[in-house]
Amino acid sequence: MEQDSKFQANCSLENNSQGKVPFISKLAYGMGDVGCNFSWMFVGNFLMIFYTDVFGISMSAVATLMLVSRFWDAINDPIIGTLTDKTHTRWGRFRPWLLFGAPITALVLILTFWAHPEWSQTAKIIYMAVTYCILVLGYTCVNLPYGTLCGAMTQDIDERAKLNTSRSVSAMMAIGVINIVTVPLISWFGAGDTKYGYLAVAVLYGIIFAACHLFCFHKTKEVVEVPVEQKLPLKVQLRSVMKNKPYLLALLGQLLFGFIHYGRNADMLYYFTYVEGSATLFSYYSMAIIVPSIIGAACFPLVFRKTGNKGFTAAIFAFLTGITMIGLYFFSPNGSAILFYLFSALSWFFFSGFNTAIYAIIPDCVEYGEWKTGIRNDGFQYAFISLGNKIGMALGTSLLAIALGSAGYVSNAVQNPEVLSIMHHAFSTIPGVLWIITAGCLCFYKLNKKQYKQIMTDLENKKK
């Protein structure tokens, strides 16, 4: 009788895992990425210029922090990933991390944007290093389980595509709002005191970050069967990952994504402030890209339906992103505004399609790995995806800081031609070429819809 009840429970769980995800859960999952962006996009777009132009920290110190902090990530990301796999609560494996991690991370975000320009350079660097490293850890504790949650909500490949579309559309809306309102909000809250303006915005965004993740926690549900807990040595898990070719390509895609996207984002405010002459243009630019970004994200399922391959879909979007970003080099919002904003809109239309596709790949790679090796370690795999993205981010932002510092960047001053040239190319041609390279790499992704369905059939037969 006990065996019959267990069998019925497992069958029920499997049916649920292949079923439709309720609309409110899709909405809540998307809201999770709204929260993520109100912290991490704020950090990616504004923290570097906050450190150099508001806090008064040298460009070389900022570059060093961005690189050194990745060693910290290399330690904490796999640990957090393993801990999420070992978490077993009445709420599931991943959702509890949102409940407890989001409020704490929101507080650390506020502390990170609390400037003390009157301190000594040594004190500033210590404060920067401590708050940033704790912020990175807190973000990992929330974002890693959040990203893995998609694979626990359903095993249906089309439902996962819809979940990731909801995530990406929500993210693009959040990014647009952040980019449009942040500069005016800093000015409005600060009333002439930029230091206070940044702090007030951090408080607001921290509240939004926590609220979105708490909503995500309450309205989502983990239905995929939790595997029997296995005590697997690190080398065994690493070996299983190395045999997962689709996952390795997804990891490479995330590394390149982090390098290109966050490096360019860190440059954008410098570009508009110093090359084009006005930080206000950044808000106009953001207004031009918000609607195309949302539409581009929503187009992912349509393109995927035609290709049947998420990796190839990502490659198409990446290639077109690269072409349009290279085109941006030849136009200026001051001299050729229509063409500048047209190419900006197109580049973000294609980028948001890529953004949806590259995250939609990850849950499918987990099932491929389970089918290939017999090991299912969602959290561990997502940890290295997160780490790859962060390493890319660190390399992109630190190389930008090193290049600007070496060329003679001086905060809040007229920049020399070499500095302006670096800012211009970092906004257009460099990311454009790198997006085309990314497209070439993702063309080798072979896990298509037909193969995935066969993998799921094989896995279900094994469970029976």
Where are these regions (language model features)?
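Membrane-embedded alpha-helical bundles of multi-pass transporters/translocases
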Residues: E2-K464
